[in-house]
Structure formats: structure tokens, C-alpha cells
């Protein structure tokens, strides 16, 4: 929300409150309070940065305006409002059945909205814990040729970006994730660390809770100093205040603790536990001068009056200049740009934003359906009170007073529903946090905070107005004389009420159809997703992540020897059928490589620009995963690091070698001008879907070897988790400094691949079911009221010879006509709305005919049942009794 929009909102709020001020005082009152508001314009503009005290001060200002407006009202109005409230509460208590149903219906809608809003508030709306977070952005290399929008960059590129731009006040860098091993203590602990430039913390505008952050001098002299996260300080040092100056052994080397960050600080993710200067990175020497080493990510702070669009245009121009100045080959690097992403968007991701907004839209629909239901209940109850209102009008009560009476009752009902809804939301939030997939950012920040409480209060008052307007509108248009003469039953007022109720049913059905279509599409997508083959057999597989202390000296042959010994020892354990190691089974990175096929020109098919990932593996990993061999052979035990052989996956074979046998062909990594180190293709294996089941297969090349972080997988004949202790012991016996973590099973791993979609689909289906139940109850209520209103007519029909089946058709036909109109309207709306969730679908069109037809029949079936019960009751009407009663 922009500064101008924020101020307009508060100005609008003052003007709305001014409506209750007497007209003769209204102009002066508004001028006075608007002038007061303009004095606070600076605070309003900085709303996202204000502490709780200043936010409460602004809210108190609005409350003060409201109380002042009430104070200006005549005393008589205050007394009348108290009388209305007392009378309304008595009437609600007099009809406990109606009151209970209305409160529960509204509480479900309000509770669902509050629970989902609490998630949206924590993930999307709450400011990040930095100074002016809305001016922070991540800067990535944009590689259109490989379709990668967020690639890392090199240190020389960072220096050029920093010196050539005019719109960022500063740029800083950090590594792209740096797992380290804390080797001091009883056993090694693997934590996520980051190498960052000295200006990162000042750029973020965050000061340490203890000590200080490292300086440019620390960076220049390669000082081994470290800043700890609040969590690591508590866990590793027991929150000792004398931690500054103590040593912490990282990857076998001692670093001095110089600072501890605040409890709410994290960057770039909440997994990051410590920060070190960029110059102590194990890969710094030799790599920091490489123009095309993509080891770094860049964060920038926009100048006060700069926009993200302006920054994007400027950085694109800088990127183009650099690509032309430092090309490796025209084919490889020309056209590189820079992608500027607002930090909040970077943290949440566009798909998550869309999913949360879809869920928020779903609960809004549920709330509207609940309001329509309660409005129908209020209309039916209002019809029974027609004579009461007519008598009060005859005794001198004005229509305004009667309308205010009904709105007061609605507000009281909404207030109680809001309190119950808040309780349901509290339970719902706990359930959401418990069942939500762990990759939702800021999950631990989801709480019922003052902002959520304000939202609940606002929603409660809004619902009170929504369901109270229909009966209040009817009272304002009714003629007391007609009501007194006709007694309310079967009157023209009853006809108008049935028409209004019918309109609300149409709206309910349309909203329900829209929800059911969205849920149906998500269900069909999820079913399609579950049928996707992950490329390996997950049953009976144990996975453990193994990390060695990382250093430039401990790469290559030593690492390969370590993993070879571990694999041999684990393979000897009872029940183990096969063991292997792979660099990154979950493929936690983007394609970052390219190849050139021997004998092809630079512009030939399958040259350097295609998406490609290179993985180091042990010789028997495919046997452990049960990945099918399509052509050629697997690696042998003798083929280790530096062997000039590779295995490719099916996607790469199809893309680079269409219609030919790739076995025996040679490739090299990089473009045509790269070093001529050729690798022979000895095998083709099936594709592994490892990031997300719905993600398109990526071209992969597998090389024999190992790095310091590997996934160890063992296929066993019994329960995989029973082997955990033995595997830990074998790894520690080979190298006590190795950290073992991330233990899981293959089955659980595959479930995680679709956890986010399962969560979204489950919630949407739940809300759709609630909507269907509410719509069915609404149809039942309207048809039951219609039968009660037409008892006299039905009695006459039966007395004149109509059969029970005729009455049944009459009542069901009336309800089904309304439902049919609602379904048709909902299908048309769904045809447009379903396109908004296209990005969330997999293997299903947004206009899938089967889903639309299925939803229509489902709602028509539920409506048929809801209509049948009142219709069956109508067939039991005694003609003589109904005529005598009239």
C-alpha cells in the first residue's frame, strides 16, 4: 500500500465515522478531525516501520474520533440504542434455535476467514524484520537462453553492478547457501552458514543484539570472525552474555565470535545460523576473480524515490553492457540480463502468493454463503414479526427506529459469532501450522496478533451489516396497515420475502459452484500428480545426508575415499541390498551447466544453452534407487573421480540425440570454446523427478565422484528406520568429524514432493464441502419457509383433488428452478475464475468439462435432497385443518 493510499484510507475512515454526527455539526467536525489527521500523515506513511505503540496511537486516534462523534449525539439516541440492544438480546434468547444456528453458521465463516487471513498476514503482509523492507530487492543473473530467471552471479559482476548503477544506495553479496560443520563439542553438527560482505548488515539496517558485525577491515585481512544467529547462540553457548571473543570451530578451523543477531533476524533464510566474511570462503581464492563463476547472490537497497521498474530497466542495460564486454562466446553469454526481485516476493514466491490468495478468496465465498443463509433466517424470522413491527409503527415508532432495531440485533449476533469464530480460528491456526508443509516461509510467525484481531472485528461488523440489510430493507418498505389487515401469512409481503430468499439462494448456489469447481480441479490435479512416476522405487529406501568439513584442501580423492569406505561398510550391514551416494537427490538448485557434443557446430542442436545439471554419484546409486537402465551400462567400481565417462538421463538423450544412439558419443562441459576435456557416454537411465513431481524433467549428466555433501541411500529388506543407528556408527567410524542429518525414508521423500499441493487441495476441498453444506441448509430453509407460507394454497390444491406427487413436483420444482439458475450463473463465473488458478493445476485444463459437469450434478443432487424434505412435509398437509386455520 502506497503512502497516498494509506492516507486516503484513514481519511475515508474519518469521513465514514462522521456520518453519525448531527448534520449541523458535521462539516466543522470533519474539518477538525481531518486537520488532526494531517498532522499524523508522516506516521501513516511509515505504517510498515512503526512499532506497536505508534500503531496503537493511530488506532486510538480513530477510536477517539468515533467516541467524539457518539458524544455529539443527543442523549435520547444513546438511550434508544441501549434499549434496542436490550430488546434485541431478549428476542435472540427467546428463539434459541434460530440464534444457535445463526451463530454457528456465521462463526464457521468468520473463523475460516480469520484463520486464513492470519496465514496471509504472516506470510505476505507483515513487514520483513529489516529497515524499510519494501525498498530491498534481490538481484539475479537472468539467463533467457536456459530459461533461468534467478541465477547467481560472480564477484566481478557484483563489483560492476555496484559501481555502475544509480538507483541503489548500496549492494551487498552473500553466498548461495554454505553448509558448515561445527566440529567443537561432543559430536559434529551441520548448520547452514553464509559468507557475506561486510556491508550486508548496515544495508539491511539491523544491529546485533550483542557485540558487533564484521568490518571492511575484517574482510580485507581475511579475519576468521563469525556472527551468530540468536538460536545458535542459545543452543551452542547457553545464551551466555560473555560469548563475545570465544572460539567456535567451523569446518575444523577456529573462528572468533564477535556478534549475536536479534531473535527476529534472519537472512537469507531462517535456516541460516551464522555469517562469515566472504574472504574466508573455502572457494574464495581463485574464484573471486572469475567473471563467470555464479557463486554469489546480490541484495540491494533502492534509493528513496526509485522504483523497482526503474531499477529493472537500469540493471538490464548494465547486464547487456557486461555481456558484450566480457563474452566467453557469443553463443554462451550474449543477452544475459539482471532480474530485480522485491525481497518479499523472493521470500514467498509467486505460486505461494497465488495459492494463499485463492484460499483467501475461498473463505470469503464461504462467509458470503453463511451471510446469505443467516439473511434468509432473518427474513423468515422477520416475517413472523410483521405484526409486531406493524403494531410498533402504529404506536409511533419510525421506520428508522425499526431498521436500527434489526441492525442492532444483527450486530449483536455478529459480535457473538465473531467471538466464537475467533476461538475456532485459534484452533484452526494451530492445525494449519501443524499440518502445513515446512517450505511455507515464516510459518512460525503465524499467530492471532492485533492485526488479525482487528480483521476479525471488522469482518464481524461487516457480516452483521450484510445479513442484516435484507430484513432491514424489507421493514423499511413494508406497509404497516397491510400487515395488520392481512396478518402476514400469505400476504404480498410474504411473496416479496420469498422472492428475496430465492435471490439469496441463487447467489449461494453460484458461489458454491465456483468453490466446488476450484476444489474439483485441484482434486483432479492432485490425482494426476499422484500417478506421476518419480523415476525410482521409494519403498524400502533409507536416506541420510552426510557432510564433511568443507575446505579447499579436502576435496577430490580424500572425499571419494571417505564415501567409498562408508558405502562398503553400510553395504555389509544385515538386510542391506544396495547402497549408493548422490550429490543431491532432492536437486536443490537450478540447472547450472551446459554441454557441447563432439563434432557439432556451435549453432547445432543441443549446444550449450539447454538446461542441464551435472551430478556426482557413486557407481551403484542407480541400483540402490532401482532406476531403470535404458541403454548401455552403469559405472563400474573402478570408475571414480576423473574417469572420462558419464551417464545421461532420458530427457537429455531425447533432447540432444533425437533418433540416434548416444552410447559412445562424446561431450564436454561448457560451450564450443571451452577446454577440450571429452567424456564418453556409457549409459542412459530413466528420469528422476526430484524437486516437484509436476516439474518438467531436466537434462542431467551423472559423473563418477563425490563432494563434501552427499546423500547416502540404502535399500533394505526391512524397516529402513531400524537401520539408522548402525549407519550413524559406520559413518562416524570412518570419520568422526562427518555430520549425519536429514534422515528420512524414500516413501516420505516422495510424499514431501507433493506436500504443498496436498495441503492446498485439502483446505480448498474442506471449504468447498462447508459451502455445499451451507448451501444445502439454505435451500432447505427457504423451501421450508415457502411451504409454511403456502400451506393454505397447498390445502386448497389437495382439497380440489391434487395428488401428493403433484404437490411434491410443485415444491421440488420451485427449489430446483432456483438451484438451476444459481448453477448456471456459477458455471459461467467459474469459467472465468478458474483461469486464475491455472498455475496451480497439473495435467488438467482450467475449463475441464468433466469437473464442471460433475460439480453441476453434485450441487443439483444436494439441492434435490434439500428440497425433498420440505416437499414431503407439504404432502402431509391436512386440507381441512389448513383451511380452518386460515
Over which residues does each language-model region extend?
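Interfacial "coupling" helices/loops that link adjacent transmembrane helices in transporter permeases
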Residues: 370-414, 777-819, 823, 836, ...
Amino acid at each position: 500500500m502506497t503512502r497516498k493510499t494509506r492516507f486516503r484510507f484513514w481519511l475515508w475512515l474519518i469521513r465514514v465515522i462522521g456520518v453519525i454526527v448531527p448534520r449541523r455539526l458535521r462539516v466543522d467536525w470533519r474539518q477538525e478531525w481531518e486537520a488532526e489527521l494531517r498532522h499524523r500523515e508522516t506516521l501513516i506513511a511509515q505504517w510498515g516501520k512503526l512499532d506497536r505503540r505508534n500503531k496503537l496511537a493511530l488506532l486510538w486516534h480513530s477510536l477517539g474520533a468515533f467516541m467524539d462523534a457518539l458524544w455529539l449525539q443527543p442523549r435520547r439516541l444513546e438511550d434508544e440504542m441501549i434499549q434496542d440492544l436490550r430488546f434485541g438480546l431478549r428476542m435472540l434468547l427467546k428463539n434459541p434455535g434460530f440464534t444457535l444456528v445463526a451463530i454457528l453458521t456465521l462463526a464457521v465463516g468468520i473463523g475460516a476467514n480469520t484463520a486464513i487471513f492470519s496465514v496471509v498476514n504472516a506470510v505476505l503482509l507483515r513487514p520483513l524484520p529489516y529497515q524499510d523492507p519494501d525498498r530491498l530487492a534481490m538481484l539475479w543473473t537472468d539467463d533467457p537462453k536456459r530459461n533461468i530467471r534467478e541465477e547467481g552471479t560472480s564477484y566481478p559482476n557484483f563489483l560492476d553492478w555496484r559501481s555502475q548503477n544509480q538507483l541503489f544506495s548500496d549492494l551487498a553479496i552473500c553466498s548461495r547457501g554454505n553448509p558448515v560443520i561445527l566440529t567443537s563439542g561432543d559430536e559434529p553438527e551441520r548448520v547452514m552458514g553464509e559468507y557475506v560482505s561486510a556491508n550486508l548488515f548496515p544495508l539491511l539496517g539491523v544491529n546485533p543484539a550483542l557485540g558487533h558485525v564484521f568490518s571492511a577491515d575484517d574482510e580485507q585481512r581475511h579475519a576468521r570472525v563469525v556472527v551468530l544467529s540468536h538460536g545458535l547462540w542459545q543452543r551452542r553457548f547457553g545464551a551466555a552474555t560473555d560469548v563475545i571473543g570465544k572460539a567456535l570451530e567451523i569446518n575444523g578451523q577456529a573462528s572468533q565470535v564477535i556478534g549475536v543477531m536479534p531473535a527476529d533476524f534472519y537472512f537469507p533464510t531462517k535456516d541460516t545460523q551464522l555469517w562469515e566474511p566472504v574472504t574466508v570462503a573455502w572457494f574464495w581464492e581463485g574464484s573471486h576473480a572469475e567473471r563467470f563463476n555464479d557463486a554469489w547472490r546480490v541484495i540491494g537497497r533502492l534509493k528513496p524515490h526509485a522504483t523497482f521498474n526503474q531499477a529493472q530497466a537500469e540493471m538490464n542495460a548494465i547486464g547487456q553492457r557486461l555481456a558484450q564486454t566480457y563474452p566467453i562466446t557469443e553463443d554462451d553469454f550474449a543477452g544475459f540480463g539482471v532480474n530485480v526481485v522485491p525481497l518479499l516476493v523472493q521470500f514467498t514466491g509467486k505460486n505461494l502468493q497465488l495459492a494463499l490468495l485463492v484460499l483467501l478468496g475461498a473463505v470469503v465465498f464461504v462467509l458470503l454463503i453463511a451471510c446469505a443463509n443467516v439473511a434468509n433466517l432473518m427474513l423468515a424470522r422477520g416475517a413472523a414479526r410483521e405484526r409486531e413491527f406493524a403494531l410498533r409503527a402504529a404506536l409511533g415508532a419510525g421506520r428508522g427506529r425499526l431498521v436500527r432495531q434489526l441492525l442492532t440485533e444483527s450486530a449483536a449476533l455478529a459480535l457473538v459469532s465473531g467471538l466464537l469464530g475467533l476461538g475456532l480460528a485459534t484452533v484452526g491456526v494451530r492445525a494449519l501450522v501443524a499440518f502445513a508443509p515446512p517450505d511455507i516461509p515464516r510459518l512460525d510467525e503465524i499467530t492471532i496478533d492485533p492485526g488479525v484481531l482487528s480483521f476479525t472485528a471488522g469482518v464481524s461488523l461487516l457480516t452483521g451489516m450484510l445479513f442484516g440489510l435484507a430484513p432491514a430493507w424489507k421493514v423499511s418498505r413494508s406497509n404497516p396497515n397491510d400487515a395488520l389487515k392481512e396478518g402476514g401469512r400469505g400476504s404480498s409481503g410474504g411473496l416479496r420475502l420469498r422472492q428475496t430468499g430465492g435471490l439469496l439462494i441463487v447467489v449461494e448456489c453460484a458461489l458454491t459452484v465456483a468453490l466446488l469447481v476450484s476444489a474439483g480441479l485441484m482434486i483432479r490435479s492432485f490425482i494426476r500428480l499422484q500417478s506421476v512416476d518419480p523415476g525410482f522405487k521409494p519403498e524400502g529406501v533409507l536416506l541420510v545426508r552426510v557432510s564433511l568439513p568443507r575446505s579447499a584442501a579436502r576435496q577430490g580423492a580424500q572425499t571419494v575415499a571417505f564415501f567409498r569406505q562408508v558405502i562398503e561398510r553400510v553395504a555389509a550391514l544385515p538386510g542391506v541390498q544396495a547402497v549408493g551416494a548422490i550429490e543431491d537427490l532432492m536437486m536443490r538448485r537450478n540447472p547450472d551447466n551446459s554441454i557441447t557434443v563432439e563434432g557439432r557446430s556451435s549453432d547445432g542442436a543441443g549446444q550449450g544453452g539447454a538446461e542441464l545439471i551435472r551430478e556426482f554419484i557413486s557407481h551403484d546409486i542407480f541400483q540402490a534407487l532401482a532406476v531403470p537402465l535404458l541403454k548401455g551400462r552403469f559405472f563400474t567400481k573402478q570408475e571414480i573421480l576423473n574417469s572420462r565417462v558419464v551417464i545421461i538421463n532420458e530427457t537429455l538423450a531425447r533432447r540432444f540425440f533425437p533418433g540416434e544412439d548416444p552410447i559412445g558419443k562424446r561431450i564436454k562441459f561448457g560451450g564450443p570454446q571451452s577446454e577440450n576435456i571429452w567424456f564418453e557416454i556409457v549409459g542412459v537411465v530413466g528420469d528422476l523427478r526430484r524437486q516437484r513431481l509436476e516439474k518438467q524433467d531436466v537434462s542431467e549428466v551423472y559423473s563418477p565422484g563425490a563432494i563434501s555433501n552427499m546423500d547416502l541411500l540404502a535399500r533394505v529388506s526391512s524397516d529402513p528406520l531400524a537401520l539408522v543407528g548402525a549407519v550413524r556408527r559406520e559413518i562416524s567410524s570412518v570419520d568422526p568429524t562427518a555430520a549425519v542429518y536429514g534422515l528420512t525414508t524414500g516413501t516420505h521423500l516422495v510424499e514431501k514432493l507433493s506436500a504443498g499441493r496436498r495441503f492446498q487441495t485439502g483446505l480448498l476441498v474442506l471449504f468447498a464441502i462447508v459451502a455445499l453444506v451451507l448451501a444445502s441448509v439454505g435451500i432447505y430453509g427457504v423451501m421450508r419457509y415457502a411451504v409454511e407460507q403456502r400451506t393454505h394454497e397447498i390445502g386448497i390444491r389437495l382439497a380440489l383433488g391434487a395428488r401428493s406427487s403433484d404437490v411434491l413436483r410443485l415444491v421440488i420444482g420451485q427449489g430446483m428452478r432456483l438451484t438451476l439458475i444459481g448453477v448456471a450463473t456459477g458455471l459461467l463465473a467459474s469459467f472465468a475464475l478458474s483461469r486464475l488458478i491455472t498455475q496451480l493445476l497439473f495435467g488438467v485444463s482450467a475449463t475441464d468439462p468433466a469437473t464442471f459437469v460433475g460439480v453441476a450434478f453434485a450441487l443439483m443432487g444436494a439441492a434435490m435432497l434439500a428440497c425433498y424434505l420440505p416437499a414431503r412435509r407439504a404432502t402431509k398437509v391436512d386440507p381441512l385443518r389448513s383451511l380452518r386455520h386460515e
